[in-house]
Amino acid sequence: MIYLDNAATTLHKPPQVEQAILEALHTAGNPGRGAHEPTLHAARIVLDTRLALAELFHAPDPSCIVFSANATMALNTVLNGVLHPGDHVITTVCEHNSVLRPLYRLRAQGVEVSFTGVDAAAQLCYDQWETLLHPTTRALVVTGASNVTGNGTDLARAADFAHRHGLLFIVDAAQTAGAQPIDVQQLGIDALCFTGHKALLGPQGTGGAYVRPSLRVAPLLVGGSGVHSFDEMHPLQMPTALEAGTLNVHGLAGLCAGVRWLLEQGVENLAAREAALARLFYEQVRTAPGVTVYGDMAMQPRAPIVALNIAQEDSARVADILWEDYGICVRAGAHCAPLMHKALGTVEQGVVRFSFSHFNTEQEVQQAAQAVCALAREILCE
């Protein structure tokens, strides 16, 4: 089996991740719910994970890191916690439904939403931002990189625009956290939402957000906190304010191990290897008859993704053949990014997405490219 669906979830993790989860299953209690060793050990796991992520993102304090089940939950928490009826938001057509659907629901409640388009290479049209600006514009919400094309967002340019106009700068880092260096202080990011199970190399069911210390986010959930139990209102201090209920300590133990491994290896080093693998694949398939590649493969930074179609063949059929005949795992279809597909003209066909990990080998990439070329020849001869 050749696994090239890492933008959906990374299958291959460092062995330390599994070891940490198994150890936590047998040793961790419920953090903040007692003074015995199992609960204290759980609290140490949670703190260690905050510290690791704060180091990775260059956050000023570990209390800026809050945990959730995934990036979707983190985005819902942040967007619903800072936007109100009458506010205006600028976002992009590159966004995942984890951004779009919360914004659509907020739009039904009186929040106005404007979308930035893309050019022929699926690059953001940054110049549109100035034309979309309103007196009531409250936030700029962007993805770090498209989960369809891999095209990255120029976060420095986005930050400059947001800061010049006094906007909140919110980033969906589902595809970039752990895959690209991110310095939230240097960029002046107000909220960075991430998932644990992709490039951060943790297990599914983990994720969260960096929230700028002075930013107040109204909690999406309230309830048990382990502190101030006689208060009717949920505690306001961070990170407790945004972490109602028992945390996924076992998952966080694995996430911490994954992040620590990333820090040891160096995100820049791993990103360079992934970029080289994506480039190797692209160079071998881009001239194959009938193959169309989407996105700007020359731009940097970008996610290690190559999205393509073969003639007019349904992307799902291509993915099925790649798995059944070649043992290659890829993702086909809409990728939960409907506006991106409208911009690309691939609403009906979808695209076949190959996404690479530093755990992949050159041989695997070459085999996948050869399979695409062979399949393209077969389809064109049908």
Model-assigned labels for residue ranges:
Residues M1-E382:
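Pyridoxal 5′-phosphate
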